[in-house]
Amino acid sequence: MSNHMLVERVLKLIKPIVDNLNFELYHLEFKREGNNNYLRIFIDKEEGNISLEDCEAVSRAVSDILDREDPIRDPYYLEVSSPGIERTLYTHEHLKRYIGFNVIVNIQGLLKGKKKYQGKLLSFDESVLRVSCEGEEIVIPKSKISTVNLKDDL
């Protein structure tokens, strides 16, 4: 089973549980690092920060169905956490939520001689992101973007 198919299968199993606990399933990934497999669940909520207790509650709740349905044949470690302050913005919903916030856009290759742009996220559509960098609007083709992360302004 491909990694994408595995993530989709796990997503279908755990999303209703995470939703029922009043958390947002922000992101889900399955990765091999060294000799170990990791299923990482990133949760968020509308108000306040994610606590250790929140992560424990989600971990306990999803462990039951993962053990019962057994979608992952190989041994793995389950990790549940917040997406963090400088979270990656994966989806259109994530981008929409953080319009007006400072972001770091990492570029594949170079764009106007740079590998990275930092500035305020102005807007986006299907093909480009618009970021205000030092007073100049930069239009970045999505095809050139490696990652977009929130910038910690603290």
Curated annotation (Swiss-Prot):
Q: Which InterPro entries match?
A: Ribosome_maturation_RimP, RimP_C, RimP_C_sf, RimP_N, RimP_N_sf
| Biological process according to GO | ribosomal small subunit assembly; translation
Q: Where in the cell is it found?
A: Cytoplasm
Gene Ontology CC terms, in alphabetical order: cytosol
- Its principal location? cytoplasm
Keyword line: Cytoplasm, Ribosome biogenesis
SUPFAM superfamilies named among the record's database cross-references? YhbC-like, C-terminal domain, YhbC-like, N-terminal domain
| Disulfide pattern | none
Which Gene3D superfamilies does the entry mention? Ribosome maturation factor RimP, C-terminal domain, RimP-like superfamily, N-terminal
Report if keyword RNA-binding is assigned.
no
Sum up the protein's function in the record's words: Required for maturation of 30S ribosomal subunits.
Question: What is the similarity comment for this entry?
Answer: Belongs to the RimP family.
- The name this protein carries in UniProt is Ribosome maturation factor RimP
